[in-house]
UniProtKB/Swiss-Prot annotation:
Keyword Endoplasmic reticulum: no
Keywords from the UniProt entry: Nodulation, Plasmid
Chain intervals for the UniProt region annotation (Disordered): 448-471
Protein name, UniProt field: Nodulation protein NolX
Pfam families recorded: NolX
Length: 471
């Protein structure tokens, strides 16, 4: 089940997400509701048969085709009713609506402990696995307290997939308790990012579910910086590099094949982790030789900063990014005449109707492109905040937010062949349910864009290398 399918399921079938804890609370009313429906149908059936019975014994009074009609009525006594009444009665027999309609918005006052599912055991339902998978994609918004969940649902800034998952979680206080009770089995009323990682580690079901999702994501990839109407394609190494670069602020300090598997399984210490990042991690899990080749063929585990150095010279830029660089290069006085290029300056240029439309378009594109901005911003400094054991004092700032004319010149003149090569993805139409669910999740990821990277002060001298991998 896709995260995009949670919301309509919640609105139409709220009881499907309610687990054993709510079943205890609602059991009397559920039984009563079901008994009422059954009694009503039994009464209706008996009443119909009482009327049909005498007629059935008087064959001489029946028209030629009545016998078959009566047999049909005995099988379906509702057939005599007008269509609107029949539809109303049949709708009563739908357990999710009849059983809990009056408590559609009921929320337990606190998480509920259960033996069905615990912090390190028990079996999760498929909807619960989907809830956990979505929560694992939003560890940056933890901790989540039980009391804050409804506010999160009503917060316009809450990503749509997380909103749907929280609405489902509100109907499953047992799952909340199990996640939030890591270590000692006692829930303090909140879920932390560490709780989610540990819960995922203790429940192999989560890893199996998320690995299946990740494989589908990698086969039905939509870039996180694409338009909403984009079509999916099979992820490439370049796609994986770009996604990991864009969301590097939320990745673990070290990256390896084992770390990527933890990202896929929900066990890693991550922040924002949309389906695009999960697909990137899965890509390298599935192609370990490509990961190692980035570092000469033998190295697996690297510092995140080392990855950024290599990725910056190994990834391809889009045609829009190359066009932006070309425009900036031919209008350097406009972009750098009054000093360094900042996001505020780009916003002002994008809104300045007196400027050439191409200049405004380039300013707008760079403003909305954290990947290209980062490449320019760190072209001279590189990404390492410490270059040696004895480095201290002075130095530079990584992700400073200020792009100098020298920064631009360094990157533009040292772009690699890979940087200048525009990739041509082969799009396809998702045909299976799994593929369609993956595409829906990918589009959910478009709403979870990376935040502006925070400046990081270096403790020592800046990187003096003139190679592209340092910028």
């Amino acid at each position: 089940m896709s995260a995009s399918n949670l919301l309509p399921m919640i609105s139409s079938n709220p009881a499907q997400f309610a687990q054993a804890s709510l079943a205890k609370a609602f059991a009397p009313r559920v039984a009563q509701g079901q008994q009422s429906v059954l009694s009503f149908e039994a009464m209706l059936s008996t009443n119909m048969l009482d009327r049909i019975g005498p007629l059935a014994s008087r064959e001489d009074l029946l028209p030629p085709d009545a016998e078959s009609t009566l047999e049909d009525l005995q099988k379906d006594p509702l057939a005599l009713l007008p269509p609107h009444m029949r539809a109303a009665i049949e709708s009563m027999d739908q357990t999710p609506q009849s059983a809990v309609a009056i408590d559609d918005h009921y929320v337990a006052p606190a998480p509920i402990q259960s033996s069905r599912i615990t912090w390190n055991g028990g079996s999760l339902t498929k909807p619960e696995l989907q809830i956990v998978a979505v929560l694992n994609r939003h560890k940056d918004l933890c901790p989540l307290s039980w009391e804050s969940l409804e506010a999160k649902v009503n917060d316009p800034s809450t990503p749509p997939d997380l909103k749907a998952a929280i609405e489902a979680l509100l109907q499953d206080p047992e799952l909340f308790y199990a996640i939030g009770s890591q270590g000692d089995g006692r829930c303090g009323g909140k879920i932390t990012a560490k709780d989610l990682s540990e819960f995922s580690k203790h429940h192999p079901q989560v890893a199996a579910f998320q690995e299946s999702q990740a494989q589908s994501y990698a086969q039905n990839y939509i870039p996180s910086d694409s338009a909403e109407n984009a079509q999916p394609s099979v992820m490439t190494e370049n796609d994986a590099l770009r996604e990991l670069y864009r969301y590097s602020e939320y990745l673990p300090k070290n990256l390896s094949l084992a770390d990527f598997k933890q990202i896929v399984d929900g066990e890693a210490k991550t922040g924002k982790c949309p389906p695009q990042v999960i697909a990137a991690a899965q890509y390298f899990v599935s192609h370990p030789e490509e990961w190692k080749r980035l570092y000469g063929g033998n190295i697996d585990k690297v510092h995140k900063e080392d990855f950024l150095e290599v990725a910056s010279s190994s990834m391809s830029l889009t045609q829009a990014e190359l066009d932006t660089l070309k425009t900036i290069n031919s209008h350097q006085e406009l972009f750098f005449g009054s000093g360094d290029l900042t996001r505020d300056k780009l916003a002002s240029m994008a809104d300045d109707k007196s400027l050439d439309p191409k200049v405004r378009e380039a300013a707008s594109q760079l403003l909305s492109d954290p990947l290209l901005f980062g490449l320019l911003n760190n072209a001279i400094t590189g990404y390492k905040t410490h270059h040696g054991f004895f480095d201290f004092g002075g130095g530079h700032t990584v992700d400073s937010g200020n792009v100098s004319k020298e920064d631009f010149g360094r990157f533009y003149t040292n772009m690699t062949t890979a940087n200048r090569t525009v990739q041509q993805p082969k799009f396809h139409v998702p045909e299976t349910e799994a593929a369609q669910n993956a595409v829906a999740d990918m589009k959910m990821g478009l709403a979870d864009q990376p935040d502006i990277k925070s400046p990081k002060k270096n403790g020592g001298a800046s990187c003096m290398s003139s190679t592209p991998c340092c910028g």
